[in-house]
Structures are given as structure tokens and as C-alpha cells.
């Protein structure tokens, strides 16, 4: 059994999802959530919240592998830079906790889940709910994290060719 944490880094909201994958690549959903920092805190405080909360999630679930979305360049350079800070903290936590990190482009994740690399968020959520039956996930950040984790399973299992 392999336990995987999927991560969708963000400064305001960092989505996470935990799944187990058995030797036949069957997926069992264990949990998901969002680390919210709010915008009233300073930059350093927000990064510290992400750091501490993600460490707690990893400690609680003890995943053996991590899957994270690669950063994309936004039209707004400030947004891209801020996302980079949050992503850097997530990578630091993965390094500190000695988790193997696997990075995936957003379009690759979408293609592996929906068959369309340019699918919108609703299409991704719809397909994630088809893959994980009886899933009640409300936040798209957690759904994105789950999609990244599922993408990792598909990639490891050679179900999907890049």
C-alpha cells in the first residue's frame, strides 16, 4: 500500500488530499482539506501557517510520496511570485519530512483526469467524483490536490502516457 499526498499550493489556500494506492492501483480516498491563511496576516505569518499546518497533515496521515502541481506563470507577476513563496514552503516541508516529491504540470494533471489538458475546474471536479465514488468535496483547492494525487497514481501505474 502506498499513501500519497496531493498538493495544490497557494498563499491564501493550499489544498491537500490523501489517498492510498494498493498493488493493483486501486485508489482509496482518506481525506482532504484546505490550509487557509487569510489576508490579514503578514507574508511571513502566512507562510508559517502553511508550514505548520502541512507538517500536521503529514504527521497525521504519514504519506510516503507527494505529488504537487508545478508553478505556472500568471499574467500578474506579483501573483506568480506570491504563489512561488507558498510553493517553496510546501517543498521545504516535503524535504524536511523526507517525502519523495513528484511534480506535474497543470495541463498534464487535467489531461490525465479528464482527457483534456485544458479542462476547466468543473470538469476536473466532475471526473474526480467519477473516480472516487461518494466523494463530498466542496473546495476546489482540495479537489485540485486530489486530482494531482490521482494523476500521480495513473502515472506510476503507466495508465497514462505523457
UniProtKB/Swiss-Prot annotation:
Against InterPro entries, the record matches this protein to: RNaseH-like_sf (IPR012337), RNaseH_sf (IPR036397), X-over_junc_endoDNase_RuvC (IPR002176)
The enzyme's first-digit EC class, named in words, is hydrolase
- Which Pfam families does this UniProt record tie to the protein? RuvC
BP GO annotations: DNA recombination; DNA repair
Binding positions for Mg(2+) 1 per the UniProt entry: 8, 141
Any idea which positions bind Mg(2+) 2? 69
Q: Which GO terms describe its molecular function?
A: crossover junction DNA endonuclease activity; DNA binding; magnesium ion binding
Q: Which residues form the active site?
A: 8, 69, 141
Q: Which reaction does it catalyse?
A: Endonucleolytic cleavage at a junction such as a reciprocal single-stranded crossover between two homologous DNA duplexes (Holliday junction)
Major site of localization recorded for this protein: cytoplasm
What detail does the entry give on cofactor binding?
Binds 2 Mg(2+) ion per subunit.
Relate the assembly described in the record. Homodimer which binds Holliday junction (HJ) DNA. The HJ becomes 2-fold symmetrical on binding to RuvC with unstacked arms; it has a different conformation from HJ DNA in complex with RuvA. In the full resolvosome a probable DNA-RuvA(4)-RuvB(12)-RuvC(2) complex forms which resolves the HJ.
**Of which family is this protein a member?**
Belongs to the RuvC family.
Q: What is this protein called?
A: Crossover junction endodeoxyribonuclease RuvC
Amino acid at each position: 500500500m502506498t499513501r500519497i499526498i496531493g498538493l495544490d499550493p497557494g498563499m491564501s489556500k493550499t489544498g491537500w488530499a490523501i489517498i492510498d494506492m494498493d498493488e493493483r492501483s486501486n485508489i482509496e480516498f482518506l481525506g482532504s482539506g484546505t490550509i487557509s491563511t487569510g489576508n490579514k496576516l503578514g507574508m511571513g505569518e502566512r507562510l508559517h501557517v502553511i508550514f505548520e499546518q502541512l507538517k500536521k497533515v503529514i504527521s497525521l496521515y504519514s504519506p510516503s510520496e507527494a505529488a504537487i502541481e508545478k508553478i505556472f506563470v500568471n499574467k500578474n507577476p506579483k501573483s506568480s511570485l506570491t504563489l512561488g513563496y507558498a510553493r517553496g514552503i510546501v517543498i521545504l516541508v516535503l524535504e524536511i519530512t523526507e517525502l519523495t516529491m513528484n511534480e506535474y504540470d497543470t495541463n498534464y494533471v487535467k489531461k490525465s483526469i479528464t482527457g483534456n489538458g485544458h479542462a476547466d475546474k468543473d470538469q476536473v471536479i466532475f471526473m474526480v467524483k467519477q473516480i472516487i465514488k461518494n466523494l463530498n468535496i466542496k473546495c476546489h483547492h482540495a479537489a485540485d490536490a486530489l486530482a494531482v494525487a490521482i494523476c500521480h497514481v495513473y502515472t506510476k501505474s503507466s495508465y497514462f502516457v505523457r
